Amino acid sequence: GDGLDVGTAVTGLVTAFQRTPEAMMAFTFTLFTAMRSLLQQAGLPVNSVLYIVGIQGFGKSQLAKRYCTLFDDSTRRLPANSFDAGSTFASIRDALAQQRDLVVLLDDLCHSSIASEEAKRRKLLSRVIRSATNITSFGKKSGNRNVEITCAAGLVVTAEMLPSAASELTRCVLLRLDHQLADFEPS
C-alpha cells in the first residue's frame, strides 16, 4: 500500500527520540491525551497542560506541530485545533470542550513591546490554562442561558514567557528548551 509501513514509522520515531529527547516528551503527552477519556473513566487525573517554553527560534512551534498535533486542517493549511495569541478565548474554549482526546495547541505566545498587548496575551493564557485544567465544568453563553461545558482535550502551549501566577504554573508539565533543537528550523 501507499505510505510508511509500521516498522519504518516506529524506527523513525525512535531515531527522532534519540536525537531529540524533547520530542519524546511532547509525543508522550500526545499519547496521554489520546487516552484521556479512558484514564478519566478509571478515575485517574487527566487535567494538565504541556507548556513548551524557550526563546525565539529554538523550535517550540515545530516541536509541538510535529509531535503533538497529529491532524491538519486542510482549509486553514495549519495543524487542526491550532490557535495563536490573536485567537479568542471562546474559540479555544470551544475546541477544548469539543476535541475529545485530541491536542489543542495555543502557539507562539511571545512578549510584546506594547504593554497592553502583552497583558491581553497573559490574560488569554491564564484563562485557557484554567479552563484546560479545572475538573469542574466552565460556562458558555448559548442564547440567553449559560451552558456548562467541560474540557475534553489536552492543551499544549508554546511560549517565550512563563505563566504569571504560580497556581497556573503548577498546572503545567513544563518543557523548557534551553537550546535550539536539532533538525528544527525557526518558523
Please place each PLM-identified region on the residue numbering.
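Conserved catalytic/switch belt of AAA+ P-loop NTPases
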Residues: 119-146
